[in-house]
Structures are given as C-alpha cells and as structure tokens.
Amino acid sequence: MHLRSIALSGVAFCALLTPLAATAQAPAATVKPAPVADLIKKVDIAYNEFTLPNGLRVIVHTDRKAPVVAVSVWYNIGSKFEPKGRTGFAHLFEHLMFNGSENAPGDFFDPLKQVGATELNGTPNYDRTNDFETVPTPALEKALFLESDRMGYLLGAVTQEVLDEQRGVVQNEKRQGDNRPYGLIQYKLLDGLFSSDHPYGHSVIGSLADLDAASLDDVKGWFRNHYGPNNAVLVLA
C-alpha cells in the first residue's frame, strides 16, 4: 500500500507538471509595435504659435503648476552650415553669446542668477544652436530683454580681446575632448559615415587651424548672416 500511494502521488505530481511544461514551450505572442505616427498623435501638448513682424517664431505652452518659465531660443544654424575653412564657428558663437552684449555687458549668467534662474546653458549641434534658461515668472521680462539684446546687439561687445579669449576656451575644450580615452573615435566615425564635403563631414567643435584663422570680421559676418530673429524660434513654457 505504501508503494502504491507513492506511485499515485508521483502520477498526480506529473499531471500537475505537464501543463506548466507545455505552457513554457509555447512561443510568446508577438506584439506589433504601433506606427510612429500614431504614437506622435498621442503626445498632446497644447501650445500657441505666432510670428512677430521681425520674423521671430514664438511658441508658448501654458502650465501654471509652478511659478517658473522655461525660455529657449533655437537658432537655425549649426555646424552643417559652416563652409570649408570656417569650421567651429557655430560652437564659437555658443561661447560668445554668453559673454555679454551691448546693453548688458559682462557675463550673461550674472543678471539671471541674481533673479534666481536655473538651467542656464547653450548647446551647438549639426543642425541648430540652442540657448536656454528657466526663470521665476516675475523675471520673464528680464530674461527676454537679455535674449533680445544678444540677438540684436551682440557684436558691439565682441572685441578682438573677447574673440581671442573665447577662441582659446573653445580650443582648450577640443584638446580636452581629444585627449580623453577614445576621444578621437568621433572623427573616425565621421570619416567612415560621410565624405569630406558632406555637411556632417566635420565635427561640431571644428578644427584648431580654422579657429586660429578666424578674424574679427569673419566672426561678425557669420553672426550677421545667421543670428537674426527671422532665423530663430523662441519657445516659452
């Protein structure tokens, strides 16, 4: 009787195991990903958009959960627009634009820090340059004044001394990046992906030789051609 009980228990246990094994062996159902267009439609961020008489596009998103405003200016200029011999200009101006303007001389960050701004920075890229800060709502007028002054009146503050200083900063940035472990791999990737005359064929930071050769007139001409309100988008949230 004892052996019979053990045998029956074993059969019962195997009976329990069989469905589990069958389930484990069944192929998992394939879930087809949703089309990207459908996913984009689900991102519903309300905003208003208008264009000022000077050509500046303005996009405003209102969310009053916190008394702050994110201010972001996107310039439609990046390294892909740089001609041969002028590489690194977009990145150079990302630095120059934080060095003061005609009606707001000195460090761009200082007056914003005084009103409690956070997230202050700028980023150059292949296709665009972006400057941004987040300020308390009462300081929005101050932030817009500073942005408008460096958009329209930057060049009066760009002297040969300022150019030389910021040129040196950018070149030092490049040296630091190049001398990190694997720092040169980006150049190998660009060489492998694009031809030398392709807009993406050179790095955003540019070459030391091109930066050395840049004159004050070259730099000012670059700004006049690319940093006007009709080539920018102001985003407020």
Would you name each region that the model predicts?
Residues S9-P19:
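Bacterial N-terminal signal peptides
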Residues M1-A7:
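Bacterial Sec-dependent N-terminal signal peptides
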Residues L20-A24:
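Sec/Tat signal peptide C-region and signal peptidase I cleavage site
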Residues S9, K80-E82, G206:
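Short hydrophobic "helix-edge" motifs at membrane interfaces and signal-peptide entry regions
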Residues G55, R64-P111:
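Active/ligand-binding-proximal structured segments within catalytic/core domains
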Residues K32-S79:
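Mature N-terminal segment immediately following signal peptide/propeptide cleavage
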Residues H2, A15, Q25-A29, A46, ...:
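Charge-rich, well-structured scaffold segments of protease-associated domains
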